[in-house]
Regions:
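Secreted, disulfide-rich extracellular signaling modules
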Residues: 1-108
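Residue-level detector of buried hydrophobic side-chain packing
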Residues: 1-2, 18, 58, 100, ...
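Solvent-exposed coil/turn segments that connect beta secondary-structure elements
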Residues: 5-7, 21-23, 63, 80-82, ...
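Short acidic, Gly/Pro-enriched loop/turn segments at secondary-structure junctions
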Residues: 8-14, 28, 163-164, 274-275, ...
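Residues that flank catalytic or metal-binding motifs in active/ligand-binding sites
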Residues: 12-14, 54, 71, 85, ...
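Intrinsically disordered, low-complexity segments enriched in small residues
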Residues: 18, 99-192, 200-202, 220-226
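Low-complexity, Pro/Ser/Thr- and charge-rich linker/hinge segments at domain boundaries
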Residues: 26-30, 106-121, 285, 308, ...
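Extended charged/polar low-complexity repeat regions
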Residues: 154, 160, 170-174, 180-416
Length: 416
């Protein structure tokens, strides 16, 4: 937000419009007759009320995202030509100088209150491009169960915000819907808890001033965190409870984040439970999950990476399997389903981030032969020159499919 204050109270209600400046300009030489070009689109506006002094705010969120990438020419504040009165604003040389307010929130995952553009790659899954921050979340259904006693279905999630991490043995940027974690952070001198859900969204919890063992959810999802003697619980408004081990470490200025703790149990309002068991020597890797009907889904690992997920009725050759390839910084993940159908995921490495650039449903892979794609989604990113500290946002998505041997384009979308 850009915040400004008027110097004089206007004699009539006055509108102020905010526009993006399109070219560089010099504050020492700029004049009314020699101004840089500005956008024809209003970023925001406000109305200064007659005979009042007040602070006014302009929402410049979309511009701030461009500024992160280096394109910053500022904004122009002006009154519509139809206005008969005017409003004079304080400059940077006064006590009431203009200022910016930047508010940060984790928008890394999928939330119902955010807006996304979705792309289908058939069997390979669904991509979701955030229209707020350009982040990519890609989901792939691994296993499915039915029933009334908390059945367990496992979904793979790729999150481009986390694509510099391989914390769960699922590949860079990947986790499953069951890889839910809890840790502490030091923020503005206060210790807060961070719950990360199954698609990578971070939910921050701040201490309740009236109860030192309880924390409230700042994302306004009506979640309550409570620190007990043996564990930590998070309860939602439907009385569903998630249980985590105690996070005993305390973050410091030198180490502002603690290690993460994996979820142990999920319980619904009537007492049905899902129990998550971690690998003994790798506390963030899941060994097995037991649902409310005592059905056990197991995850198996080779060289630290998950190579298959088995439901109770499956064996090692007839389940969802994962194969990882890395040749000269060209990474590929193949997923093979129980029925032999396959999905393929390709990555580009940029500044330590493993960016998903293609997700495809393919015919069965044959070594030394090019894969035949049945459905495909490809992505392009900003900051491809990999400048450290700048985000990798989706700028383009293309969806194609094959019909009667012909490749057809279903969607071709640019994001700005």
């Amino acid at each position: 937000k850009l915040c400004v204050r008027n110097v004089y109270a206007p004699t009539a209600d006055t509108a102020i419009m905010c526009k993006e400046v399109l070219k560089d300009w010099d504050p020492e030489t700029i004049t009314y007759d020699h101004q840089p070009d500005v956008s024809g689109v209003y970023q925001d506006y406000c109305r200064v009320v007659k005979n009042q002094y007040s602070w006014k705010e302009f929402d410049v969120t979309s511009l701030a995202r461009k500024w992160y990438l280096g394109e910053n020419h500022g904004v122009q504040l002006s009154a519509p030509k139809s206005e008969s009165s005017f409003s004079q604003l304080h400059s940077s040389e006064t006590a009431n100088q203009p200022y910016f307010v930047l508010e940060y929130a984790s928008l890394a995952g999928l939330e119902s209150y955010l807006t996304y553009d979705h792309q289908s790659a058939g069997l390979a899954g669904t991509g979701s491009v955030s229209l707020v921050n350009g982040n990519l979340i890609f989901s792939h259904a691994d296993t499915a169960m039915n029933g009334n006693r908390l059945p367990v279905s496992v979904t793979h999630y790729y999150n481009s915000c986390d694509s510099d991490k391989d914390e769960f043995g699922m590949g860079y940027g990947w986790r499953t819907s069951l890889h839910q974690t809890l840790h502490k952070v030091l923020y503005n001198g206060e210790v807060e808890f961070v719950y990360t859900d199954g698609d990578g969204t971070e939910h921050f919890f701040k201490k309740n001033k009236n109860d030192q063992k309880k924390y409230f959810d700042q994302s306004e999802l009506s979640l309550t965190l409570e620190v007990g003697d043996a564990n930590i619980t998070i309860t939602d408004k439907g009385d569903n409870v998630m249980t985590f081990p105690l996070v005993s470490d305390t973050p410091t200025e030198d180490a502002p984040e603690t290690g993460k703790a994996l979820i142990q149990k999920i319980q619904d309002a009537v007492g049905n439970e899902v129990v998550v068991t971690a690998v003994a020597d790798a506390p963030l890797k899941i060994a097995s999950v037991t649902d409310g009907a005592n059905r056990v889904t197991t995850l198996h690992y080779t060289d630290g990476r998950c190579d298959r997920i088995q439901t109770p009725w499956q064996d090692a050759e007839n389940c969802v399997r994962f194969d990882y390839y890395d040749f000269y910084n060209e990474e590929t993940l193949y997923i093979t389903h129980e029925d032999g159908r396959m999905s393929k995921y390709e990555y580009a490495l940029a500044n330590g981030y493993h960016l998903l650039v293609s997700a495809s449903a393919i015919e069965k892979h044959v070594d030394q032969q090019p894969d035949k794609k049945l459905a495909d989604v490809t992505y392009e990113y900003s900051n491809t020159n990999a400048i450290d500290g700048l985000p990798h946002c989706i700028t383009h998505a293309t969806v194609t499919g094959t019909k009667n041997g012909t490749t057809l384009t279903a969607a071709n979308v640019s994001y700005t």
